[in-house]
Amino acid sequence: QEEPCATGPCCRRCKFKRAGKVCRVARGDWNDDYCTGKSCDCPKNPWNG
């Protein structure tokens, strides 16, 4: 069962977006960042330095 969330780039209608959903689009040499499915925050991609 999903935990509710109020706001954030990985929330939609008070639920977490699915894991793997892009939450921050790549810029320059950086890669996209993806939702984890467990948080409303958009975690930083570890490959982005």
From Swiss-Prot:
Outcome (variant: K21A): Only inhibition of platelet aggregation
Result of changing K17A: Loss of inhibition of wound closure, and of platelet aggregation
Positions of disulphide bridges: C5-C14, C10-C35, C11-C40, C23-C42
UniProt keyword Disulfide bond, yes or no: yes
Mutation effect (N31A): Loss of inhibition of wound closure, and of platelet aggregation
Segments carrying motif Cell attachment site: 27-29
Disintegrin domain segment(s): 1-49
Database matches in SMART domains: DISIN
Subcellular location: Secreted
Domain of life: Eukaryota
Subunit structure as annotated in this protein's UniProt entry: Monomer.
Family listed: Belongs to the venom metalloproteinase (M12B) family. P-II subfamily. P-IIa sub-subfamily.
Described purpose of this protein according to its UniProt entry: Is a potent inhibitor of ADP-induced platelet aggregation. Acts by binding to alpha-IIb/beta-3 (ITGA2B/ITGB3) receptor on the platelet surface. Binds with the same high affinity to resting and activated platelets. Also binds the alpha-4/beta-1 (ITGA4/ITGB1) integrin. Is a potent inhibitor of human and murine melanoma metastases in mouse model systems, also due to the inhibition of binding between the alpha-4/beta-1 integrin and the vascular cell adhesion protein VCAM1.
Protein's UniProt name: Disintegrin eristostatin
Source species: Eristicophis macmahoni
Classification of source organism: Eukaryota, Metazoa, Chordata, Craniata, Vertebrata
